[in-house]
């Protein structure tokens, strides 16, 4: 590529909110949990895994070894609901063997965390409504408790559950009257007042 690493942030800022770190990740040289800065070759231990978007690390040997198959899967959606393929079946066979408990045999695959949270909420709403109807309760059961300082995405339902450091990002979006509670956490420095809370 002809773009110089030191020009990347300025180039991106022309079209996106480029308020991320100054480090420019070298996708070829980064490895394991180490990010290599494309600008100067410095290495940084990744302690935040791109907010869980990069939890496997960088250039995992098994993934690199199988990049031809992964490339094929990247350009063709494999988890189609109406027509199937060998890669989907192979994955689901392994998934069922190692990750599916006997009491949760059904799977539903979705593209991304926000949409997964949305579908979990819809499942919970449906379940609660059915429980209430079976008990003769007319209420919908559509209330949710969530934590302060949480991030669950910026799609419909998840927007209410997400706290943002910049309220301008969501101030005109409709939200639900759900219940926000403080998340359990330890604050530093630890003193006698903090220890009383533990």
Model-derived features: positions:
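Glycine-rich loop-to-alpha-helix module at the N-terminal edge of alpha/beta enzyme cores
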Residues: 2-5, 14-17, 24, 43-134
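Short, functionally important structural connectors and interaction interfaces within domains
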Residues: 4, 17-19, 48, 143, ...
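Short loop/turn motifs at secondary-structure junctions and domain boundaries
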Residues: 22-31
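Short, acidic, Ser/Thr-enriched surface-loop or helix-capping motifs
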Residues: 37-39
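PLP-dependent aspartate aminotransferase-fold enzymes
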Residues: 93-198
């Amino acid at each position: 590529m002809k773009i110089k690493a030191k020009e990347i942030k300025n180039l991106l800022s022309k079209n996106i909110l480029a308020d991320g770190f100054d480090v420019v990740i070298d996708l070829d040289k980064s490895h394991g949990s180490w990010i290599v800065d494309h600008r100067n070759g410095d290495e940084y231990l990744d302690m935040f895994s791109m907010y869980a978007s990069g939890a496997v690390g960088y250039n995992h040997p098994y993934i690199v070894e199988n990049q031809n198959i992964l490339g094929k899967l990247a350009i063709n959606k494999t988890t189609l609901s109406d027509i199937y393929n060998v890669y989907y079946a192979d994955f689901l066979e392994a998934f069922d063997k190692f990750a599916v408990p006997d009491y949760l045999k059904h799977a539903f695959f979705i593209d991304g965390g926000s949409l997964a949270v949305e579908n979990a909420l819809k499942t919970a709403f449906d379940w609660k409504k059915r429980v209430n109807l079976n008990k003769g309760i007319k209420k919908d059961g559509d209330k949710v408790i969530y934590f302060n300082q949480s991030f669950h995405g910026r799609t419909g339902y998840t927007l209410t559950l997400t706290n943002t450091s910049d309220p301008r990002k969501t101030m005109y979006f409709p939200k639900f009257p759900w219940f926000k509670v403080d998340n359990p956490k330890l604050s530093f420095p630890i003193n006698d007042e903090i220890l009383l809370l533990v």
